[in-house]
Amino acid sequence: QALDDIISRCEIDILSAPFDDPTDDARHYQIGSYTDCWGSTWVNHQAGIIGEVKEYPFADFNKVWNYESPKKLFLSGISGFEKTKAFIDTHKDKFILGGWISLFERMQYLRGTENLFMDTLIESPEYFKLMEIVEDFYNTYLDEWLKLEVDGIIFGDDWGSQRSLLISPETWRKQYKPLYKRFFDKVHTAGKFVFMHSDGYILELYDDLIEIGVDAIN
C-alpha cells in the first residue's frame, strides 16, 4: 500500500505509443489455436497470456529459401500510425517509446526453440537465411517507427535463464551482437534512444550491450 501511495503521487513520465499493427494478432490472448501471419501455429490454454508456438514454419529448414515474411501486410497497415501520431501530439510533455522489436524470439517462433539452439552451433546457411529474413522485416518495421516523433525504440528478447544465458556469451557476441548493433546504430542516427528488455540472468552481456548502444535496459 505504501508503494501504491508513492506511485499515485508521481506522474508517469514514459509512455508507449499505441499502433494498430496488422501483424499483431489479437488472438494471442484468447484460448484456442491459430496460425499467425508468419505461419507459426499457437496454442493457448489460458486467456490473457500469449500461449506457445507448437508448429513452426521452418521445422523443415529447406522452406526458408522460398519464404515471404509479412512485410507487405505490415506496410499495408501504415494508416494505423494515424492514431499513433495523435497520441504523440497529445503527450508532447512525455518521453514516448515506440515499437517492439524481438529478433531472437521471432526466430524461435519460426524455427522452434530447441532447433534454434542447435542452429547456433551448426551455423548452416539456412540459419543465417532465417536471421536475414527476420532482420529484413524488422528493418522495414523500424524505418516506419523512426519517421515518427517518438523518443525511443523498444527491443525485447529474453536471453537469460535463472542462472545463465541461453547460449554461450561467445556465440552471442559472434552471431547476435553485430545484428543488434546494426539496429541500434540506425536508432541513434535518427536521434532516438534504445531501450531493451530481457528476462533472465544476462549480466555477462551488460558490457556488450553498453558498447553497442543500449541506453536503458529492463
What are the roles of these predicted feature ranges?
Residues 2-19, 144-150:
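Catalytic domains of carbohydrate-active enzymes, especially glycoside hydrolases
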Residues 7, 55-64:
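Active-site-proximal helix-loop elements at catalytic-domain edges
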